[in-house]
Curated annotation (Swiss-Prot):
GO terms for molecular function: 4 iron, 4 sulfur cluster binding; DNA-directed RNA polymerase activity; metal ion binding. NCBIfam families: PRK02249.1-4. Regulatory subunit of DNA primase, an RNA polymerase that catalyzes the synthesis of short RNA molecules used as primers for DNA polymerase during DNA replication. Stabilizes and modulates the activity of the small subunit, increasing the rate of DNA synthesis, and conferring RNA synthesis capability. The DNA polymerase activity may enable DNA primase to also catalyze primer extension after primer synthesis. May also play a role in DNA repair. Heterodimer of a small subunit (PriS) and a large subunit (PriL). Binds 1 [4Fe-4S] cluster. [4Fe-4S] cluster binds at C237, C309, C318, C325. This is DNA primase large subunit PriL. Belongs to the eukaryotic-type primase large subunit family. Residues 340-360 are annotated as: Disordered.
Amino acid sequence: MNARHARYPFLGDARDAVEEAGVDLARVVTEDDAVVERARERVVSALTDGTIGEPAATVSTRVEVLSYPVARVLVSIVDESVLVRKYATAEADAAYDRFTADESTDTDLKSVSDTTRVSRDTLLSEFDLRAHVHATPDAHTVDVPTYLLLASSLRDDDWRLVNRALDDGRVPVTDAELDTLIREAIRERVADGLPLSVPDQIADALDEPVAAIQDALADLDLTREIDTVVPELFPPCMKHLLDQVQRGDHLPHHARFAITSFLSNVGLSTDEIVDIYEVNPGFGEEMTRYQTDHIQGDSSPTEYTAPSCATMKAYGNCVNPDDLCDAINHPLSYYEVKLDDGDDDDLADWRDREDDDSPD
């Protein structure tokens, strides 16, 4: 195990190095507190600030390398989709920062030896992308199927294929854009296979760090950047309220706040929410825009989260609950589970549906 494995623990040769060292994971989690603590830090930091934390100077290369597979075990034991996503994103972001620094000619690499660096070409080969990414005089082109696969989770309109130039079945991309696509490949690699099946012997030894992660998860702000709008997957309560809005029914203030805050939390802009309300006879653009901006924190110091299930029940807005409703306590949690259980190929954001101009 070397320094490059510590910086890029998802690489195949890092995994091979761990196997060649004959590491017994069951012994590590029971006897090596430093590895377990660093693994806990990776996961908790992913939840609290979107990073994997910076290892202390006293953390050895071995500890840093082994903390990665132990972190994946911790994520698997907790077994929450939001944790898998946030952890994989944090690991990918950390790797992105490192390999783009390695590539940059403007970065002082005196402290980064050749044995710790990873090039863009190395990563393309690692993810079997070399045959699908082609050098050009300007930068690169990416085969369309590969581009669609890697860009599928990137929500900015600039990544939509309809907004890209095409060159003989390939998508031209800049160096920076290619690095972003590589970051997505890393994220998929980290998330692949999670949650793992964890033997009871290992899970029992990790009770304390698992409890710490669960505490951090409980404190997680639900107003995360979902930014995917698939009304078919909305919880029954929000489907009902959205149907009422689109039928032109009058909604009391608490119901209007519930659906507006939910739509805001899942990624709709003020303009998009105003467009939805236009069909309602009680619609007033100025007031709707003001209320939505206030909920989103644009005109107030607070960004509001959609009401919890308990609040929805208290106001009589909990309707048609299904089996999943019994297992969650917040409409956003319901939607998150539905998104994670869905097939990415079938999750068409209503904003991307060419034939629809509203989330029916």
